[in-house]
Amino acid sequence: MKFSEPLVEGRLIRRYKRFLADVQLPDGTEVTAHCPNTGSMLGCQPENARVWLSRSDNPKRKLQYTWELVETEPGVLACVNTVRPNAQARAAIEAGVVQSLAGYAQCRAEVRYGSEKSRIDLLLSGHDHDPDAWVEVKNVTLAEGGEGYFPDAVTERGQKHLRELMAQVQNGDRAVLFFVVNHTGIEQVRPADHIDARYGQLLREACEAGVEVIAYRAALAGEDGDPSGRLELVEEVPVSLEP
């Protein structure tokens, strides 16, 4: 799984209005890129950081560029495009990378479910032995000393998803919280109790109720270190629920 076209490198000037980022290209040109991330992006927007943009030739688009990657510190990459994780997770599942979710015949996206009117990211069905698996995907980019934390801001929506997953377990199905680790410096994932204590509490309750929690890290760079290379998930990362 790769970017469809080579990315364009630049330097971050600023992010503003949540969805916009000004970037200076190598020739000195300044462009405004779409920032497809509604979170705080804590730790992922250092001043003058190296960033990589995808480019669209669609004349109907208001902004030609989309912010994809950032170098959070020398040699460490993060993918800030929150549109990517669902496709990354699905590709890994269908390729057999995620052993705990292997053997399902069908994968559907954005299926309506639950009493709180949610949409599940991925619904796996058609397994010979296991019940259907409801998979909620979350992007992890907040890193502190090798630890990855989720969420990076208080998330009532994320809390709702945990309640919905617990309900699916009660209904007799599998429910899975899938952390896509889009940061090459993260070695372990844990709940960000210091940011959203309620989310951490609910996550632990969900695990006790039977919700499965897994995490896989993306490559983000090719074998030659080219940051416009690989998006595929390549390695499972441990999850710790200790406070």
UniProtKB/Swiss-Prot annotation:
InterPro entries per the UniProt record, alphabetical: SfsA, SfsA_C, SfsA_N
Domain of life: Bacteria
Disulfide bonds: none
Pfam families in the cross-refs: SfsA (PF03749), SfsA_N (PF17746)
GO terms for MF: DNA binding
Similarity field: Belongs to the SfsA family.
Name of the protein in its database record: Sugar fermentation stimulation protein homolog
The species this protein was found in: Marinobacter nauticus (strain ATCC 700491 / DSM 11845 / VT8) (Marinobacter aquaeolei)
Taxonomic lineage of the native organism: Bacteria, Pseudomonadati, Pseudomonadota, Gammaproteobacteria, Pseudomonadales
Gene: sfsA
